[in-house]
Amino acid sequence: MHCDIYKFLKHDDMYIYIARPDYPNDTDEIKDWLGVLPKDFRAGLGRSKFVMHLDLATTPTLARVDKEEVLAKLASQGYFVQLPPQDVMRRQAELRARESQDSIYNT
């Protein structure tokens, strides 16, 4: 299974894998590969940036996610969302809370 990986400027350390089951025979026309994402979800992501193309058949392991889980999601829904590790998410939430609190009391 081939896939393209995208990241989003509004969401640090979040990556979305988009299935490309017909690669390389699907490159004749320009296509909105992110069109497989639910519209509401996609709207909240902001601007995307292509990271890389990956052939999962020749990739033994992935750094932060289980390869079999990625393959299953790509096959069933056409995409996989890789969220940041919990410690990163917690740190980001704490920072946002602190910034919000500072803006309330420093005005």
From Swiss-Prot:
SUPFAM superfamilies: YcgL-like
Source superkingdom: Bacteria
Domain YcgL: 1-95
PROSITE patterns per the UniProt record, alphabetical: YCGL
Name of the molecule in the record: YcgL domain-containing protein Pcryo_0807
